[in-house]
Amino acid sequence: MRTIAIVGKPNVGKSSLFNRILMRRKSIVDDQPGVTRDRIYDIGNWLTRSFMLIDTGGIISSKDTYQDNINEQVLFAINEANTIIFLVSAKDGINNDDKKIAKMLKEKAKDKKIILVINKIESEKYYLNEGELYSFGFGKFFKISAEHGIGMGDLLDELVKDMPIQNNLEKQERFKFCIIGRPNVGKSSLTNTILGEQRVIVNAEAGSTRDSIDNDFNYYNKKYTIIDTAGIRRKGKIVESVEKYAVLRTKKAIERSQLILLVLDGSEPFKEQDEVVGGLAYNANIPTIIIVNKWDNIINKNSHTMEMVKKQIRSQFKYLSWAPIVFVSALDNKRIHTIFEAIEFVREQAMRKIATSLLNDVVIKANAFQEPPPFKGGRISISYIVQVQSQIPTFVLKCNNPKFLHFSYARYIENEIRKAFGFDSVPITLYWQDKNKKLRGE
């Protein structure tokens, strides 16, 4: 699959163009320069052609260390790409930063296709010297408005004209999981260690990752997509509109995932905000693995330390009692393999399908062994059970009247199913339904 990178100075509309090509809002757009910090990846499609699209941070000359990191990210993207969109702004005109980028592209991307694109032509007041644009040496250029969609058809035709027809099946086959946690627990360090490269900027500043970033990779011939998300702060600390959108992005990333890695900082006491983020995982009702990061930073460990930490987690995160706990040190690349062992273990459980006859044997026997208590003037009686979904194991239990069900008895039946069929590391869902109400398809 061909790769296209969008580069340019800050605030020329790179993220707006990225979103316009994808036809949805993937990158955060804001008038504040420097909003895009890492490389953002997604698959675009045009005229039955598929391509990988990369949004990058704005390049400027600066002595700031963080800006140096952004510039380095852009160079990574240029190296990965087959085609470069060099974006400038008609509204702001050409300046020295644009000229420096053009020079850099001639040096760093001389063997790649470079397309000069002039954005923001919707502005009533703009002036561009076409002779100056041709002096860049990139030949033909395109005038567009990413915000309003003007000129996009011609640009997209140019981007895909030499591309083979390709579908999106590879993306669909990948097992997708996201990394969540409060700021500064090491989510981006963990992503980088897993990917084996500096794809996400790691910075000691809490909240340095604002976008959710999709990264495709293979691990021992298995295909995965990992989503690194913005750290979720307490509501009182979210003051920027960009930060608010990043929190929404994290929740959307959870919705797109098949599994969650909840990262905790093992080098300090767990905080209330860790529990809040854990609540998002619980509410999502999808498989979750708790990752205790920075394990090597804990001093004076002994043979009992790990078990003590597990007990503390079980106490503070009672609602995730089924979630496996894994201990790693992302910066030192230690015990990372245990994450994938846990992922595959949980994945197998989540996909497990139980025969209806076996389910009924277990549940009917459990119902007979422990008689349900009377509740709301009646006593529940289970007729039969059937599994209606895997991935998140889901069961429908037919009974005489669901209103007679006491929560303690529902928990008893859930535990019996978990124990009998080995669902000890995934969430399961039970729906209690009146036996006279038919399931869809019956």
Swiss-Prot record:
Entry's Gene Ontology BP terms: ribosome biogenesis
Entry keyword Metal-binding: no
Keyword annotations of the record: GTP-binding, Nucleotide-binding, Repeat, Ribosome biogenesis
PROSITE patterns documented for this protein: G_ENGA (PS51712)
Molecular-function annotations in GO: GTP binding; ribosome binding
KH-like domain ranges (all copies): 352-436
Segments forming domain EngA-type G: 2-167, 175-351
Keyword Metal-binding on entry: no
Residues at which GTP 1 binds: 8-15, 55-59, 119-122
Residues holding GTP 2: 181-188, 228-232, 293-296
Subunit: Associates with the 50S ribosomal subunit.
Biological role: GTPase that plays an essential role in the late steps of ribosome biogenesis.
Family per similarity comment: Belongs to the TRAFAC class TrmE-Era-EngA-EngB-Septin-like GTPase superfamily. EngA (Der) GTPase family.
HAMAP family noted in UniProt: GTPase_Der
PANTHER family (UniProt xref): GTPASE DER (PTHR43834:SF6)
Protein name per the record: GTPase Der
Organism name: Ureaplasma parvum serovar 3 (strain ATCC 700970)
